[in-house]
Amino acid sequence: MDLKADSEDVDYKQPAPIEDFASRSTLHGISHMFTYERVCIKRTLWILFFLGSVGALALVCVDRVQFYFQYPHVTKLDEVAAPLMTFPAVTFCNLNSFRFSRVTRNDLYHAGELXALLNGRYEIRDTHLVEENVLEILKERANFDNYKPRPFNMREFYDRTGHDIKDMLLSCYYRGVECNAENFKVIFTRYGKCYTFNSGKDGRPLLLTMKGGMGNGLELMLDIQQDEYLPVWGETDETSFEAGIKVQIHTQSEPPFIDQLGFGVAPGFQTFVSCQEQRLTYLPPPWGDCKAAPMDSDFFSTYSITACRIDCETRYLVENCNCRMVHMPGDAPYCTPEQYKECADPALDFLVERDNDYCVCKTPCNLTRFGKEMSFVKIPSKASAKYLAKKFXKTEQYIADNILVLDIYFDALNYETIEQKKAYEVAGLLGDIGGQMGLFIGASILTILELFDYLYEVLKYKLCRCVKKKHKGRGNKDRGAVLSLDDVKRHAPCENLRTPSTYPGNMLPHHPGQGNFEDFTC
């Protein structure tokens, strides 16, 4: 037994020669490149063909990978029939925000300049443009001698002077069933006091429709009350040159943004609006640019572009003007007429028309909108003018100037789906690369594993040989200083006690020769 045993020799299996591996590999062409034959021209041609195929494969794979990271998408359109559909919310506003007959002396004192009725000195503007009967009323109301103004609130002003649905609504039918003012909910927009049909608020169930076509939707006859329009002697954001109403068709979860997205309906016409519901599905980044995260707002729970815009505009005005407009949510104080004129209106106009960076609202990933086709006919006809004038106790001219009819209905009981889909996914990328590998070099994933397995065996063998050589070199150096038990027995030092003798001087390396009894003890 050795005093210090040498490291055991480990028999590492040498991998097969590359010619043997190539002969049984499933990689096409490699058996012709690594062969025991010494035909140089043939091997050279096979190497060139193989390298060319690998190069072509690399180009195609790079192209496919680049295409994948472009994240392309396609749009799928479909029409889906439905047994019944939810009727949309319909919001309308009179283009005139304030009724002239409801404007009081206190209103003129505070908001006369805002509505372009008075100048900064509380005087009537451009009296030569004023009709005589209107001028008399204004002179009476604009007499502020010894007048003590009362507190003024813009929300109350808009609510009190805005057009009343009970006065505007001449007739209302939904699917042939009569409706009334109770079916409309007041909502404030930038046009002031507006009304929404089928809002779903106050616990009211949403209205359904089971047929398409005219007569299966909403039909309104409205009086826009042009006699109540404020006289216009100047241009402000609160005055309007038009007569009629603004209408927006939207979902119940989406607040109206009627000044930007509404369409106009003129008096003297019956307007037919044929709708089709469109359900859009967009992809989030990196394939698309929709917003998948929930709404981060104190005012709205469901994300939509209009909710985002209103939320952003509200925050912008509160930050810059320390107040909010009447149609804006929140608990900040309402702007005064002076703040409307000096700060709120200019700031909001700047935000809407020129600043494209502050209010950037992404499209939601799921969106419902309503496509519209509109047509018009004249109302009243010559044959019906006298009847309508008699029915509503108005003149024929009043009927022609103020009456409009609005029909909104689904053109068919179906909806359109517009869906973005990923055009190229991981499965497609792997399929393309696998197909090209099979075409150019006849390889598969398992072929690649074969190559890696052989390379692993070769590297392991080379590495282990290097480690073994280092261990052998270190063992040879240490062996010169170690005396094994066999060496001791071979020289039998205890027997030499009876026969005096001496050991060679080099018996114990690195030590000087010594006497018999000093060398070992038996």
Curated annotation (Swiss-Prot):
Gene Ontology CC annotations of this record: dendrite; plasma membrane; postsynaptic membrane
Keyword Nucleotide-binding carried by entry: no
Keyword Cell membrane: yes
Membrane topology, as annotated: Multi-pass membrane protein
Residues exposed to the Cytoplasmic side: 1-49, 457-522
Subunit structure: Homotrimer. Heterotrimer; with other ASIC proteins producing channel with different properties.
Family: Belongs to the amiloride-sensitive sodium channel (TC 1.A.6) family. ASIC1 subfamily.
Protein name: Acid-sensing ion channel 1
